[in-house]
Amino acid sequence: MTTTIFEPGGFRYMPAVSQYSGGVAAQPGLRIERARFSRVVPLAEGFERIAQHLASLGRPNSAFCACELRSPAPFTEEGFRAFNAIYITTLERWGLMQGGVNPVARSNVCPDIDPPAQPGFHAFSYTVVDAAAAPYFIVAGSAESPEGKGDYRDNAIAFGDVSPAGLRRKAQFVLAEMERRMQALGFDWSSTTATQVYSVHDIHPFLADELVRRGAMRHGLSWHYNRPPIQHLEYEMDCRGVSTEIVLPG
């Protein structure tokens, strides 16, 4: 899998589906920073806050390269498509979409307890100029269903099976997808600074064998008691390698 350079933003990306890319990496002379809101900020307000933050750094909106969303509950397939259509309108207005191809990486998950009232931003990432920067990257979220093959439900790994064996199969698929995306960007687990898991199920039975032994937890693990964004999916991950992370007021 090859990557494509998005010159206006100073990053390259792994093409995936219309709603997001498979991952991004900073171009030479730039680095990726991650900013997390102290609480979820609703989508429209969040885009405004992101634009203000980028402007304060002297960066264009096109420097926006990744985000982590939170939604009230898992979507139906049709509901997910409708949400994505709303989400990408701002990306189109910002000049981020290239012929229908989306360069921005994204995770979108649903807190099972105390969810937000509406979809919004948990965190976002962007490029900044840094002549001495080491390579930095972000891999988009993936659940246990291949992208671009029709309905997620119809292609889900071990559909409906939340037994230890079923969850292990789901995790194996997602971990392999993380590795495939990192490899396309020129990275591996040794390059990560953070790994995140989103599931409401017990991951301990396969944690050591599937995550620790392959190096996915070299800096520990952030486990969010969240569900993937589509109904009937059970396990999602993303990962990143960045040097600067900040927290902004919600």
Language model regions located:
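RNase H-like nuclease fold core
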Residues: 126-163
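Intrinsically disordered, low-complexity acidic/Q/S/K-rich activation/interaction tracts characteristic
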Residues: 1, 18-25, 39-44, 50-59
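Short, well-ordered alpha-helical segments
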Residues: 46-54, 58-62, 67-71, 76-86, ...
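C-terminal edge-of-domain segments
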Residues: 90, 107-132, 218-250
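Extended repeat-based interaction scaffolds and adjacent low-complexity, acidic/S/T/P-biased segments
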Residues: 2-6, 13-20, 34, 38-40, ...
